[in-house]
Structure formats: structure tokens, C-alpha cells
């Protein structure tokens, strides 16, 4: 028995609506997910791989120095007063070199190189980099603090070494041009014949701490970032490609061939998270991201804060901080023991970089209130000093990022050194940096064209199929049962119903149908 034409149309329309529903909510998401898994992996053919190897645009790198306005008083034990000078703006170009793949275990080995270009026109008003900054002598204080930690009985010898190398300084501060301490370098005179300074310089040359360049005539050149600029980092990083499992993309599995560090205690020695330049797709606000920082020898675990948007693209904002090592069980393994953790918001980097430095959020944001009491001139503000990253959740692409960190040092107080005996002994700020990313219009358009435009087109087509299919079913059903509907309507019109008046009089009222005489009222 063949179906009537209207029912055929209804069946076809129903199929169209069903196909639209299935394609829009089942088939297309599966296709998109499958395609994203291929595109987000670090295989040679993907655009993500090309951008991962060499970011095709510069990152914002801003440095803020703290100028000490009462250095002479601090030398006598006064609370330091600081004034922030900055930003000194640099373009930061990132590239990975000596890239080697291992398809068998789905990994890539690489080294990295960073290039910094100073842009005075984008720096703070009037800043040229030639400004003289008064700040603690980092090299001098590092020498004293290292001896204090490693061999405190040798502080007297360290005092003689400092006097010999720095020509009997009157205080622990240096007066230095901004670009000199940042990149160009300041000269450390190791051309000494006295025992203490000569022994100290020999040790320095042997251990070759970060930031040191060896010059002729026993001279050393020290800067904060000069050694890193346009130089290949010697460490070999191994990460997952994500071809076999896209959720592993960029995950650090080894550095210099070692699958764990030998720096901290227990689980803190594990490499957890990506290398910070790529993240897995399909993020939800419940996901806890992880990235590993080789500079700080630790992983960070940003958490979801709120939903945001960037250039019309919906994003999720994640935030992070340094943490409270004493009260967070996950972080206590960064301390020698739970009762020897630094104050909230501080991390001791000595074991990581072999230099007595502490890191915190800028202006001690979210740190122990005592840190702010020990320095005047700081004004922590979450908007200006917090760590935040806005991710496009489907692809896991960072759209906007502000990674901020402050470096601090202790003004060591010690009776064994005349230069240190009156210092306040507190931890004070040196400088803070902001590494920023804002995906430019070119790559925003690329993301939209590859991800969101197809999604919207498919969504519109599917809704049209569902709408027209549903309307087609309704119309076909109505058309098919049109005769029955009309018959019922006619039958209803030809019927007479009696209505009983409100009073009990013997009256009848008829309702007039077709070809019927008017009813009489009795």
C-alpha cells in the first residue's frame, strides 16, 4: 500500500529535520573534534607546529625597576622607600631550535632562543634606558647571602673578598644605568692578587652563575638578561607531540634527558604541565591547567576565574599566583620542611638557580602583609599585578596573557660583616617583569575562519533544516487530513444545540446553521 503524497512529504520533511538535528549536535561536533585533534597536535604539517616553533609576532616584555630613594638611611637600618621606574619595553621574539622528533614515543626535543629588542617609544614617558637607578647591589648581596647559607663561618673571608672586589664600598647599593643592569652589563673587577678576592673570583668562574660573561683581563660582566638575549639555551626540553593523544600536547616529559628534577622534595621534582607555549584543546571551566616553568623549576596550576571575550570570541579567564607554601600541602615539598617555608606569596629560588633570590607577585600582591610593612612605596593591585590568561576553550588557544613576576633579595643583617651589621634584614624588591601576549587581528581572523565560521555556517544550515523539516511535517499532515478537518467543521456547523435560559420559562433558543430557518423564541 502506497503512502499518500502528503504523508510522503511529511516523511521526507521529518527525515530532513532529523538529519539536521543529528548533523548539528552529533555528527559535526564529532568531525570538528576529530579535525581539531589533528590540527592541535605538534606534527610537522600543522599550523600550530609552525607557530609553536617560531612565534610569528613579538611578545610584550616589560620591566619595572625599583629605585631606592633613601639608600643611606637603609644602610643604617631604616625601612626602604622605593619608587617604581618603568616600564622599560622590549619586544620579545621566541624561537625553538635544534628540533628533533621521535615518532615512536610521540615526543619532540628542542632548545630555545629569545631575542629582546628595546623600544623606548613604547616605554614609560621619557624613559631612555639611561636613567640611573639606585638599588641593592645584586652581585654583592648574592655573594654574602650564598656564603651565609653554605658556609656561615666564612663570612669574615667573604667580607674581605667584597672589600677587595668592590673597592671597600660604603654601602650595599649600586648606582647603575637601567640598560646596564638589564642587558649591557656592569663590570666586576676580578683582577685581584689578594687571597680573599682572588679565591672568591676563582669560585665564581668555576661555578659560572647565571648572568655572568667572562671578559679579558679577569673582568666579569654581570647583567640580569644579557646572557639570555639572542643566545641558545643549553637545556634540551622534551615534550609530547600530542599526535597519539592530543590532551598530552606540549606536556614536558624530560629536561636534559632526565624525567625528574633533583631540586626539591617528593612530587615537586616532577614535570607537570606543558611548556607554557601550547595547551590542550576542549577546555572546560572545571579543568585545572598546568604549565612548567624551567626558569623557576616549578609548575603553575592556573584556575578558572570567569568567562570573558576577546574580539568577539568567547574565552575563559584563568588566574594564578605564587601560593602559600606553608599552608598548601601540594606546595610544601618546595620547602626544606613544612616549618621552614617562606612567608605567603614568596618562593625561595636558591635551590633552583643557585642564587639567593625570592620571587613573588609584583608589589607583593596576595602576599603576607608583613612583606608590605617592610617596604614603603608599594601598591598591590590585582588588575595591574596579577597573572591572568584568557583561553579560547575549544582549541585551547591563549588569546590574551599577562604573566607577571617580581624578583626580591634579602638585605642580610650580620654582625660578622661591618657592611651588613646595620641592615634591616628584610626581603626587599628589585624589579618585576610582565610578559604579555595579545593575539593580533591576523591570527584572530585565522582562528575565526578555521573554527567559528564553519561552526556558525553548520549551525545556521542545521537550524534551517530542522525548522523547514518541522514545518514541512506539520504542513503535510494538515494537508493530508484536510478533508476530515473540513468534514468535521461542516458537521459542526449543521448541528443545533439548545440553550436553557437563566429563568425557568419555557423558552428554547436555536443556533442557526446552513439552509435553516431562524429559530423561534416561544
Curated annotation (Swiss-Prot):
Residues 500-522 are annotated as: Disordered. InterPro entries: CD36_fam. The chain crosses the membrane at residues 12-32, 459-479. Glycans are attached at residues 67, 105, 229, 440. Disulfide bonds join 268-333, 297-352, 335-341. One of its GO terms (molecular function) is scavenger receptor activity. One of its GO terms (biological process) is sensory perception of smell. It is a multi-pass membrane protein. It holds the Pfam family CD36. Signal peptide: none annotated. Principal component of the olfactory cilia membrane. Detected in both male and female antennae but not present in leg, abdomen, thorax or head. GO terms for cellular component: cytoplasm; plasma membrane. Residues 1-11, 480-522 are cytoplasmic. Residues 513-522 have a biased composition (Polar residues). Keywords: Cell membrane, Disulfide bond, Glycoprotein, Membrane, Olfaction, Receptor, Sensory transduction, Transmembrane, Transmembrane helix. It is found in: Cell membrane. Residues 33-458 are extracellular. Plays an olfactory role that is not restricted to pheromone sensitivity. Belongs to the CD36 family. This is Sensory neuron membrane protein 1. The lineage of its organism: Eukaryota, Metazoa, Ecdysozoa, Arthropoda, Hexapoda. The gene is SNMP1.
Amino acid at each position: 500500500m502506497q503512502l499518500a503524497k502528503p504523508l510522503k512529504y511529511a516523511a521526507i520533511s521529518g527525515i530532513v529535520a532529523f538529519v539536521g538535528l543529528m548533523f548539528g549536535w552529533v555528527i559535526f561536533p564529532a568531525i570538528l573534534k576529530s579535525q581539531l585533534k589533528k590540527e592541535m597536535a605538534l606534527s610537522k604539517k600543522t599550523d600550530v607546529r609552525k607557530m609553536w616553533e617560531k612565534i610569528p609576532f613579538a611578545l610584550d616584555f616589560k620591566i619595572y625597576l625599583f629605585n631606592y630613594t633613601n639608600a643611606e638611611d637603609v644602610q643604617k637600618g631604616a625601612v626602604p622607600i622605593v619608587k617604581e621606574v618603568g616600564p622599560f619595553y622590549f619586544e620579545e621574539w621566541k624561537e625553538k631550535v635544534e628540533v628533533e622528533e621521535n615518532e615512536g614515543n610521540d615526543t619532540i626535543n628542542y632548545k630555545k632562543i629569545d631575542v629582546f629588542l628595546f623600544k623606548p617609544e613604547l616605554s614609560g614617558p621619557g624613559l631612555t634606558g639611561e636613567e640611573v637607578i639606585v638599588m641593592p647591589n645584586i652581585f654583592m648581596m648574592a655573594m654574602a647571602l650564598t656564603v651565609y647559607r653554605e658556609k656561615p663561618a666564612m663570612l669574615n673571608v667573604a667580607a674581605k673578598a667584597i672589600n677587595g672586589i668592590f673597592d671597600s664600598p660604603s654601602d650595599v647599593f649600586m648606582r647603575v644605568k637601567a640598560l646596564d643592569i638589564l642587558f649591557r652589563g656592569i663590570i666586576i673587577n676580578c683582577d685581584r692578587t689578594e687571597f680573599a678576592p682572588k679565591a672568591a673570583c676563582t669560585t665564581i668562574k668555576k661555578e659560572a652563575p647565571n648572568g655572568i660573561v667572562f671578559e679579558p683581563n679577569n673582568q666579569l660582566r654581570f647583567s640580569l638578561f644579557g646572557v639570555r638575549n639572542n643566545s641558545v639555551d643549553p637545556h634540551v626540553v622534551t615534550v609530547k607531540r600530542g599526535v597519539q593523544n592530543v590532551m598530552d600536547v606540549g606536556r614536558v616529559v624530560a629536561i636534559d634527558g632526565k624525567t625528574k628534577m633533583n631540586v626539591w622534595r617528593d612530587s615537586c621534582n616532577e614535570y607537570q604541565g606543558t611548556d607554557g607555549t601550547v595547551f590542550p584543546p576542549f577546555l572546560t571551566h572545571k579543568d585545572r591547567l598546568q604549565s612548567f616553568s624551567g626558569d623557576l623549576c616549578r609548575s603553575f596550576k592556573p584556575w578558572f576565574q570567569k568567562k570573558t571575550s576577546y574580539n568577539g570570541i568567547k574565552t575563559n579567564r584563568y588566574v594564578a599566583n605564587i601560593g602559600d607554601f606553608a599552608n598548601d600541602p601540594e606546595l610544601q615539598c618546595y620547602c626544606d620542611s613544612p616549618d621552614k617555608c617562606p612567608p605567603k606569596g614568596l618562593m625561595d629560588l636558591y635551590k633552583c638557580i643557585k642564587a639567593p633570590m625570592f620571587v613573588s607577585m609584583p608589589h607583593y600582591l596576595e602576599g603576607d602583609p608583613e612583606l608590605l610593612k617592610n617596604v614603603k612605596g608599594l601598591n598591590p593591585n590585582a588588575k595591574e599585578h596579577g597573572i591572568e590568561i584568557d583561553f579560547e576553550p575549544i582549541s585551547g588557544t591563549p588569546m590574551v596573557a599577562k604573566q607577571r613576576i617580581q624578583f626580591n633579595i634579602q638585605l642580610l643583617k650580620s654582625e660578622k660583616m661591618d657592611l651588613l651589621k646595620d641592615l634591616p634584614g628584610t626581603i626587599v624588591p628589585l624589579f618585576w617583569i610582565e610578559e604579555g601576549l595579545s593575539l593580533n587581528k591576523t591570527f584572530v581572523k585565522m582562528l575565526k575562519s578555521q573554527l567559528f565560521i564553519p561552526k556558525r555556517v553548520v549551525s545556521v544550515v542545521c537550524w534551517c533544516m530542522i525548522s523547514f523539516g518541522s514545518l514541512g511535517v506539520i504542513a503535510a499532515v494538515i494537508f493530508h487530513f484536510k478533508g476530515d478537518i473540513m468534514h468535521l467543521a461542516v458537521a459542526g456547523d449543521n448541528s443545533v444545540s439548545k440553550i436553557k435560559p437563566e429563568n425557568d420559562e419555557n423558552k428554547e433558543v436555536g443556533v442557526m446553521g446552513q439552509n435553516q430557518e431562524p429559530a423561534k423564541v416561544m
